[in-house]
Amino acid sequence: MSLSSPGVHLFYHSRWQGTRVLDELCWGLEEQGVPCRAICCDDHDCALALGKLAAKSSTLRVGLGLNATGDIALTHAQLPEDRALVCGHTRAGTAQIRTLGANAGQLVKVLPFSEIK
């Protein structure tokens, strides 16, 4: 049993440390009232693998992964290992990145996802 406070975990490659990309993902979660715990993790360079690790380590079972090349994966711990709920990329822009974060919060709250434009 984990004693950490509940929140969506975001596992990211060290390249993104201190960047606006991390801020936008976390701000999207905050807009939904769901805490975000961002954790640097260079163990994998696959966004889905990072997202799966994040989801499995979160008491809420929801995780985001951000790899070195800018791929983003939103997933749930109960999904198959090779499946993400939503994928995106940092090149999509700040609004879309924030929406991915918001969608992670909406997953926790069992709300429909916002459309990524």
Curated annotation (Swiss-Prot):
Which positions are annotated as binding Mg(2+)?
Answer: E31
Q: Which Pfam families match?
A: Dehydratase_MU
The cross-references to InterPro entries, in alphabetical order and at most eight, read:
B12-dep_deHydtase_bsu (IPR010254), Dehydtase/Dehydtase_re (IPR003208), Diol/glycerol_deHydtase_re_ssu (IPR009192)
Query: Required cofactors, per record?
Result: Mg(2+)
Which terms in the Gene Ontology molecular function aspect does this entry carry? Answer: metal ion binding
Which terms are listed as keywords in the entry?
Answer: Chaperone, Magnesium, Metal-binding
Assembly description: Member of the GDR complex, probably composed of DhaF(2)/DhaG(2).
* Stated family: Belongs to the DdrB/PduH family.
Q: What does this protein do?
A: Small subunit of the glycerol dehydratase-reactivating factor (GDR), which reactivates suicidally inhibited adenosylcobalamin-dependent glycerol dehydratase.
Protein name according to UniProt:
Probable glycerol dehydratase-reactivating factor small subunit
Instruction: Write down the species.
Output: Citrobacter freundii
Source taxonomy? Bacteria, Pseudomonadati, Pseudomonadota, Gammaproteobacteria, Enterobacterales
